[in-house]
């Protein structure tokens, strides 16, 4: 059983919801990335999504775009991201880490070489935002062969056929995008999310995490009422953007602890 599957199995047995925060690797301070990952766990995260900086992050709103730009300006590439995971794994053997990003950096490294390097570093899952449906099956097969869960997005616009296809190739969890548009976009519609998740579950037996538009404890708790996990990205990246170097780790721990408390209430 993969670390991700094990984590969700334990959460289910405890009657708890998963908390999946996202940070951009190398932002805002490259030397703090591993400390921030540990801060997420201390606050109560169950899975960490670590963003791989990319120059054209088309699914991301301005907050995460700026984070990518700052990290790239500091020369944070895919190999450095894998180094962060390796350093995190030196002291945390249990918290799953999912790399989230775009196809280009992976294809530049080579998919087979990436799968091997990511597995050796201790990566548990990979979510590539821009793989078209016709390419995702081969990619998923390569990842699974390396012991990495291929994670895919579904959106309000996803067809039943797309859901069925993703159900065939995905493992770990399914990331449901609660809004049309980019990360950090406007208010989400809880009723539409609540209606959509049972449709996804008709096709896939995997846990469903919901992200995009979750900015505070109240929204997280509401989403936790209908989904298996809550994914929070833009709000965290914004907090880190605004925090000083000295405050960043504590600020992140406190924010995650508030969300965790709301989910467990």
From Swiss-Prot:
The active site is at residues 49, 60. It catalyses: (1S,2R)-1-C-(indol-3-yl)glycerol 3-phosphate + L-serine = D-glyceraldehyde 3-phosphate + L-tryptophan + H2O. Pathway: Amino-acid biosynthesis; L-tryptophan biosynthesis; L-tryptophan from chorismate: step 5/5. CDD domains: Tryptophan_synthase_alpha. GO terms for molecular function: tryptophan synthase activity. Keywords: Amino-acid biosynthesis, Aromatic amino acid biosynthesis, Lyase, Tryptophan biosynthesis. One of its GO terms (cellular component) is cytosol. Its EC number is 4.2.1.20. Belongs to the TrpA family. Tetramer of two alpha and two beta chains. The alpha subunit is responsible for the aldol cleavage of indoleglycerol phosphate to indole and glyceraldehyde 3-phosphate. This is Tryptophan synthase alpha chain. It comes from Ralstonia nicotianae (strain ATCC BAA-1114 / GMI1000). The lineage of its organism: Bacteria, Pseudomonadati, Pseudomonadota, Betaproteobacteria, Burkholderiales. The gene is trpA.
């Amino acid at each position: 059983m993969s670390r991700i599957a094990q984590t969700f199995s334990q959460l289910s047995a405890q009657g708890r919801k998963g908390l999946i925060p996202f940070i951009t690797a190398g932002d805002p301070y490259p030397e703090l990335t591993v400390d921030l990952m540990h801060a997420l766990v201390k606050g109560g995260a169950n899975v960490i999504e670590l963003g791989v900086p990319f120059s054209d992050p088309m699914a991301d709103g301005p907050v995460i775009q700026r984070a990518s730009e700052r990290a790239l300006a500091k020369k944070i590439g895919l190999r450095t991201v894998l180094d962060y995971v390796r350093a995190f794994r030196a002291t945390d053997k249990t918290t799953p880490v999912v790399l989230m990003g775009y196809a280009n950096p992976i294809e530049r490294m080579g998919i087979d070489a990436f799968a091997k390097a990511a597995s050796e570093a201790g990566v548990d899952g990979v979510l590539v935002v821009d793989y078209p449906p016709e390419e995702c099956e081969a990619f998923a097969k390569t990842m699974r062969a390396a012991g990495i869960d291929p994670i895919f997005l579904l959106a309000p616009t996803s067809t039943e056929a797309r859901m069925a296809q993703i159900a065939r190739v995905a493992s770990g969890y399914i990331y449901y995008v609660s809004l049309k548009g980019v990360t950090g976009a406007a208010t989400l519609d809880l009723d539409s999310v609540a209606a959509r998740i049972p449709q996804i579950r008709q096709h896939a037996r995997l846990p469903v995490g919901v992200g995009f538009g979750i900015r505070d404890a109240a929204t997280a708790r509401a989403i936790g009422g209908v989904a298996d996990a809550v994914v929070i990205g833009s709000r965290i990246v914004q907090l880190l953007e605004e925090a000083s170097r000295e405050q960043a780790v504590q600020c992140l721990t406190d924010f995650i602890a508030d969300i965790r408390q709301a989910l467990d209430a």
